[in-house]
Amino acid sequence: DYALAYADKSRIKFIETYLSTFNATKGKKTQFHCFPRQRAFLKALAENRNVVAIKPRQCGITTLSSAWVTGQCVFASKDAPETVLCIANKLEQAQEIIIKIRDFLEQVPRWMWGNDYFSPDPNSEKNIKSIFEKDAKGELKLFNGCRVIARASGPNASRGISAVSVLILDEAAFIEEGVA
């Protein structure tokens, strides 16, 4: 499964194999299952440099994007870490994306993080070692150099952040033109 998840740049295999999400119908967390249009969105992310999702509210795209970012961070190397910038019209909304991503990162099986973070010995310190170098409301930084940053929209939203590899503009309809 790992090799298939790694090879699948849409991250569908990774998401459906290793992640779970809240199912409102069942009222509990269940294994992530992508609907056909969600699969099409993930395939578009894999095949295109820039993707804009124009969709109604409550379609699960923010959660799906968070799951995809998780896959990108899991498979990133220290030589080419991901820098993800999440911008929303309010800081709290951008921080909600970080909460989703953190939840997904914590679901990733420990062995996927490598020998420094996993041991078959259940009493090993490796199994509880944090994958986060920074774990704050506004930013996550993983041991492999990946960063996820939350910012409110505004003229300085991306100031001080270089080499953004993934930009998420959440609820873009509420972001004023020219301030993201």
Regions found by a protein language model. Name each.
Residues 1-180:
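Phosphate/NTP-binding elements of NTP-utilizing enzymes
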